[in-house]
Amino acid sequence: MTTVTTSFVSFSPALMIFQKKSRRSSPNFRNRSTSLPIVSATLSHIEEAATTTNLIRQTNSISESLRNISLADLDPGTAKLAIGILGPALSAFGFLFILRIVMSWYPKLPVDKFPYVLAYAPTEPILVQTRKVIPPLAGVDVTPVVWFGLVSFLSEILVGPQGLLVLVSQQQVN
């Protein structure tokens, strides 16, 4: 089987046997056939595979290599350290964004005075950039809500009970 790959997408003539027959009687004008070629995405350049078994072995070795690469740089000790830093940081920013949501209800608050500046100063540089992308809707600033959602999502995905860093930190070292 000959496979031609171009920038991570391979066009394989051998895959044409798995394709359904076209209901149209007129041929496809691009390749003069009655059916379209099947495109399969791959992560490697495969010169020639004599059998499908070789192709399956190559694909399995690629997926195993990608799995090993993604977990190679992060050992359980580093994951525990990252949890210790990211967990409180994400919780603190989540709380600050909740305060900013409440502060957005009162636009005349003196944000440069003591109690309000604690929530205003760390979050405003992030919110200014986000306001350029998401303008206020009907006079209501929605950017603190967007950032609270993003911070909550990251917290759950990374350091939640089934988070990625928690799972890596519980991994047994061989």
Curated annotation (Swiss-Prot):
GO biological process, one term: cytochrome b6f complex assembly
Signal peptide bounds: none
Family membership: Belongs to the YggT family.
Residues of the transit peptide: 1-39
Record topological domains on the Stromal side: 100-147
InterPro entries hit by this protein: CCB3/YggT
Entry's transmembrane regions: 79-99, 148-168
Primary location: plastid
Subcellular location: Plastid, Chloroplast thylakoid membrane
Residue ranges annotated as Lumenal topological domain: 40-78, 169-174
Topology with respect to the bilayer: Multi-pass membrane protein
Pfam families with a match to the protein in the record: YGGT (PF02325)
Lineage: Eukaryota, Viridiplantae, Streptophyta, Embryophyta, Tracheophyta
Gene label: CCB3
Protein name: Protein COFACTOR ASSEMBLY OF COMPLEX C SUBUNIT B CCB3, chloroplastic
GO CC list: chloroplast; chloroplast thylakoid membrane
Described function: Required for the biogenesis and accumulation of native cytochrome b6 in the thylakoid membrane. Controls the conversion of apocytochrome b6 to holocytochrome b6. Required for covalent binding of the c-type heme to cytochrome b6.
Entry keywords, A to Z: Chloroplast, Membrane, Plastid, Thylakoid, Transit peptide, Transmembrane, Transmembrane helix
PANTHER family assigned: PROTEIN COFACTOR ASSEMBLY OF COMPLEX C SUBUNIT B CCB3, CHLOROPLASTIC-RELATED (PTHR33219:SF14), YLMG HOMOLOG PROTEIN 2, CHLOROPLASTIC (PTHR33219)
